[in-house]
Amino acid sequence: RFEYDNLRDGALLILWGFAKKLILAERLGTFVDQIYGNYTQYTGMLFFFVATAAFSIQIYADFSGCMDIATGTARLFGIRLAPNFLRPYFSKTMPEFWRRWHVTLGNWFKDYVFYPISISKFSLDLNKKARKRFGNEFGRIVSSAIPILAVWLLTGIWHGPDWKYV
């Protein structure tokens, strides 16, 4: 059934997504690529600090813009998708940042990569051996590092097959 609110909200979200992606992310990408691509021409840390800050905004605008376009398109058809970015740059801690960045992707990796690796026979055996060898606290850290590293690696690859993401 057609609802005007879905049409309006979906269209506005699509426009906002295109603005973030095409105006903000693309322009910042040109600047960032210029600095990082010709780093020998720039002296001083200020250029690299500004380029790194610009890259942070660029990557957020690019990913969240795409998600706004997808969410807006779904909304046109009356489908409400879960929010995917919950203002991550306003986080107070790194764990909070990662919970607010690409929420649905993080949940998927937690459910289908982190937990299965964590409860696998290999991980449980490693946990026992690490606790016996290094003590309870450090052994727990060693055995939990493998699923965390697997999630980070796969999340990086998902964002783009480039070392800057991995």
Whereabouts are the PLM-identified features?
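Membrane-embedded transmembrane alpha-helical bundles that form the catalytic cores
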Residues: 1-166
